[in-house]
Amino acid sequence: MPAWLTNRTIYFLCFLAIAGLMGFAFYLQYVKDLEPCPLCMAQRIAFVLAGLVFLAAALHNPKNTGTTVYAFLGWVTTLGGAALATRQLWLQSLPADQVPACGPGLEYMLEAFPFSEVLTMMLTGTGECAEVQWTFLGLSIPGWTLVAFIGFTAVWAFAWVRRPR
């Protein structure tokens, strides 16, 4: 392993990768006019939280116990995001007659419903979450986000195993 490839460098590179993923998400939304569904928005939140944990770890450069704490927080955010992506992939695999009904837009939900109901609707997904709007190499957007979340989870495992003792 090169000497320059410290945990701090890895954390910062992961933060930059997540910033790039968020930039690509906004590109798909605002340039390609792909409207994100509630589960997509929840996955974005998970990416932002994971990115903030990576940034905090890069700035703090934790040692033994600190690395364990950051790894735990990182695992919570990345595994939570992976669960959301898996849920959306499951919705996309349903036959058309089993897809849940489409719900209102997120802005309307935030204005009209209590936050607990909005959160439930975001995490369970609606009919628009089952729509495949874009693919690359045979994987839809939630497929690629699942790959990214698994990769970031592995980075936290690597950092935890490699932590200074």
Swiss-Prot record:
| Parts of the chain that traverse the membrane | 11-27, 46-62, 69-86, 144-162
Which SUPFAM superfamilies does the record associate with it? DsbB-like (SSF158442)
One GO location term (cellular component): plasma membrane
Cytoplasmic topological segments: 1-10, 63-68, 163-165
Q: What is its main location?
A: membrane
Gene Ontology MF term list: electron transfer activity; protein-disulfide reductase activity
Entries under PANTHER family matching the protein? DISULFIDE BOND FORMATION PROTEIN B (PTHR36570:SF3)
* Purpose of the protein: Required for disulfide bond formation in some periplasmic proteins. Acts by oxidizing the DsbA protein.
Q: What is this protein called?
A: Disulfide bond formation protein B
Organism encoding this protein: Hahella chejuensis (strain KCTC 2396)
Instruction: List the top taxonomic levels of the source.
Output: Bacteria, Pseudomonadati, Pseudomonadota, Gammaproteobacteria, Oceanospirillales
* Gene designation per UniProt: dsbB
